[in-house]
């Protein structure tokens, strides 16, 4: 799951209920994985962008199970931070309904379409490190696709080996986009990771699908449950067959002629046909000179497996703490009324221009905070390798007077708290409801920017123990990605300092591309959001003006219009506040 509020609710009332943190939580650092563990998650699904070294580090040191994507579609954007489908088509990727607009053509071809992921050659080492689960992306794929790909990876995992040429070809034929990539895993980013769907001759695909369907129809693909057996036989205690927590006991006799051997016992016990079980491990200890008829051993096996079957049919019990399922104590905290406006900027010049307008808070990029001492925006994405640089900049910012950071990932919160900063939560934490506000407050957040995927009616209903901020102006950030699309738009040359780069879609809408920390990119909406409402009625304490490509003079003009209530000229959008998402 992604929703922190729902996770908090479940963990509070059913603490032994297993919670898995979705890839939509954008967990890609050790701090983020540990924070998820501390919230109550037992497993984290890591971002697809994690490198080999990052996966190994988190798996070995986070103290929580890890799940890793090994095959299937690769999103250009970090999962959980993509709002493109929601903003342009009302189908939210954060709710599992992405319409995949990144696969469409833009200026320069298909600059947002990556090849499918394939880590078939790395399964053995993932297993060796202790990765708990391998994840195969199968959304919007046929059942036969899921069966074929899963069989290949299951064989590789069970046999602890690399794929054969034939297996690689099977994966290619069943679906690919100009081949596959392991670029994030191996750290080889760039043009080789991009591709569009490859058309494979239909007869080749049909043959694979037919074979998969035939295996299923014959029952060859029926899922079997592994069982460990322990059989002991002694004259004084009899024969005891134990199978994963159940036991069957029968008397034994002294052999008159031919005693029963361990080989004879194993032959009888391995006959599991017609059951959902297969024998994974077996240990046999039998005293010499005993006779156990085959009919007795067969009966013991049947009885033990019947007991196991009955045991599997009983739903596991979970401790559910008494009390209301939906406690409302965290939704009744009194909050101040609307106080005024905040702003985020990208440059020192923008911040300087806004300094005298009396805004509640002006947040600046961390690099600018290190020069000015203003509240700092942490990069939404940075790796464990980059964290020392982040900590150095935070130290410089604190020495100049910065005491507050804007955090867009759960991993930022413990880092900022360790260093003594007040933490304000950014939109990247995807706060949709009152329960999430309460969860974030418990984590140490004192002000939270609400999700811009929420409707105004939902925002009015939100209550919680912390202040809330609402983005009301600016080009909304639609994607953030690890691969540099700016470089690709300029023929492979680094062009981040040469003004704003745009992607143009089929409708001739122009989407600005901006460089981010670590040579990452953010894709902005083609039109700025402009919401003019009675913010006091919405229940928020502050409203944010999010400045990106505006000049300092434009920042001042727009801020003054909001402060005075004057009209603004231009082409704007209300975003999703009135339309909502599916």
Question: Each predicted region: which residue ranges?
Answer:
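Phosphate-binding/switch loop-helix module in NTP-utilizing enzymes
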Residues: 9
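Surface-exposed amphipathic alpha-helical tracts and adjacent flexible/coil segments at the periphery
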Residues: 1-5, 13, 17-20, 34-427, ...
